UniProtKB/Swiss-Prot annotation:
Major subcellular site: cytoplasm
Reactions it catalyzes: an acyl-CoA + acetyl-CoA = a 3-oxoacyl-CoA + CoA
Name the record gives this protein: 3-ketoacyl-CoA thiolase
PANTHER family with a match to the protein in the record: ACETYL-COA ACETYLTRANSFERASE, CYTOSOLIC, ACETYL-COA C-ACYLTRANSFERASE
Family: Belongs to the thiolase-like superfamily. Thiolase family.
Pathway the protein takes part in: Lipid metabolism; fatty acid beta-oxidation
List of catalytic residues: C98 (acyl-thioester intermediate), H391 (proton acceptor), C421 (proton acceptor)
InterPro entries associated with the record: Ac-CoA_C-AcTrfase_FadI, Thiolase, Thiolase-like, Thiolase_C, Thiolase_CS, Thiolase_N
Organism, scientific name: Vibrio vulnificus (strain CMCP6)
Taxonomy, superkingdom: Bacteria
EC number: 2.3.1.16
Keywords assigned by UniProt, alphabetized: Acyltransferase, Cytoplasm, Fatty acid metabolism, Lipid degradation, Lipid metabolism, Transferase
GO molecular function, one term: acetyl-CoA C-acyltransferase activity
Coiled-coil ranges (or none): none
Length: 435
């Protein structure tokens, strides 16, 4: 495999100029009535205002939404139309489950590398509160048949075949389509397979909340989070509302397992909650950013995606994707100043941390002669992770990118890894650089 270079044909790098997100809110709280498309428009509009860039200069928007809304299937285009951009701005939507905004950022970066555009916006938004509630297959078929009837008798005949259970709403699926397993069940399997104890999971969750709380108190997060005024505009939200500012280890021990009631160790407290929110990043060709006098936050140095089986260890994507991106960039784990891994579950994150250091795993699964290396926990999720901040599926990648770049800048520059697992056995990894 040749060395990956995230550059244009003229050798210019892809710069991330700015990043912004809404506060992340637990399901059915401050954003309970705000659909994902409105969250997306909200954050992109504020991003454009903060960077003081003419919206007409944006040439492409790539945005993602995991929980699709039938009435707005192309969230990216709705954002263009709702934020004052040129109506001719290219816009399309992507989904890679929990790694969606890594994918959208890569798509914009590749458009810049190809010379198709100079400036683009990437990101994602999701609402776990405003959901598409479906109907049973029998009711759906009956409604379709009903639309084709002409007489009252025909209508009554169609309706007579429906029972009360057919009228029950069908909530969105929370399990893998191919296996029927939920993410939580997979996290339980990974905890058992890799010997991740309840105490270790609770300790990571406590660490995540403690570090996130401290980061907010130290003023490190506010600059990348907008103040949102959701309709009917009678209140606002300026901070994430999932973070436990009074987190104690003893508190986690009180919760019962959520997925294996008798023998399990994965609980609601050592997992990330269902969350509403949006995040976006502004990307530019390096030279164009300098022409416009924009301060550059950092650069994308490399990226990789992975796919593995879904029957077991489905959330091991970070280990596979990180191996690929380290190989393609010629870097070692020791070259990194920071490592930020998405915490879908403490069990999943800790299992991946364990596999990073496993020679056996590297030889059997990664095609490496030895492990990638032991993760220095002083570099790992230093501002807390998704367990604390929350996880609006499509927005998490952009949150991680912005948060990591700003922290790298505070530390005087360097290289950082962002990596995430995703449904379907997918994984994502990105190397970011700040000079």
């Amino acid at each position: 495999m040749g060395k990956q270079e995230v550059k244009t044909r003229q050798g210019e790098r892809v710069a991330i100029v700015a990043g912004l997100r809404t506060p992340f809110a637990r399901q059915s709280t401050e954003f309970s009535q705000v659909p994902a498309v409105d969250l997306g428009k909200m954050v992109v509009s504020d991003l454009l205002a903060r960077t003081d860039i003419d919206p007409k200069l944006i040439e492409q928007v790539v945005f993602g939404q995991v929980v699709q809304m039938p009435e707005a299937p192309n969230i990216a285009r709705e954002i263009v139309l709702g934020t004052g951009m040129n109506i001719h701005t290219d816009a399309y939507s992507v989904t890679r489950a929990c790694a969606t905004s890594f994918q959208s950022a890569v798509n914009v970066a590749e458009s810049i590398m190809a010379g198709a555009i100079d400036i683009g916006i990437a990101g994602g938004a999701d609402s776990s509160s405003v959901l598409p509630i479906g109907v049973s297959k029998k009711l759906a078929a009956s409604l379709l048949a009903l639309s084709k009837t002409k007489t009252l008798g025909q209508k009554l005949k169609v309706l007579s075949g429906l029972g009360l259970k057919d009228l029950m709403p069908v909530p969105p699926a929370v399990a893998e389509y191919s296996t029927g397993l939920s993410m939580g069940q997979t996290a339980e399997q990974m905890a058992k397979t890799h010997g991740i104890t309840r105490a270790e999971q609770d300790a990571l969750a406590h660490r995540s909340h403690t570090l996130a709380s401290q980061a907010w108190r130290d003023g490190k997060i506010a600059g990348e989070v907008m103040t949102a005024f959701p309709e009917p505009y009678k209140k606002w939200i300026a901070e994430d509302n999932n973070i436990r500012h009074d987190s104690t280890l003893e508190g986690y021990a009180k919760l019962r397992p959520a997925f294996d009631r008798q023998y399990g160790s994965v609980t609601a407290a050592n997992s990330t909650p269902l969350t509403d929110g949006a995040a976006a990043v502004l990307l530019m060709r390096e030279g164009r950013a300098k022409e416009l006098g924009m301060e550059i936050l950092g650069y994308i140095r490399g990226y990789a995606f992975s796919a593995i089986g879904v029957e077991s260890d489905m959330l091991m994507g970070p280990s596979y994707a990180t191996s690929k991106v380290l190989q393609s960039t010629g870097l070692a784990l020791s070259d990194l100043t920071l490592i930020d891994m998405h915490e879908a579950f403490a069990a999943q994150a800790l299992a991946n941390v364990k596999m990073f250091a496993s020679d056996k795993f590297a030889q059997e699964n990664l095609g490496r002669s030895k492990a990638m290396g032991e993760i220095d926990m002083d570099k790992f999720n230093v501002l807390g992770g998704s367990i604390a901040y929350g996880h609006p599926f499509a927005a998490t990648g952009a949150r991680m990118m912005t948060q990591t770049l700003r922290e790298l800048k505070r530390r005087g520059g360097g290289l950082a890894l962002n990596t995430a697992c995703a449904a379907g056995g997918l994984g994502a990894a990105m190397i970011l650089e700040v000079e």
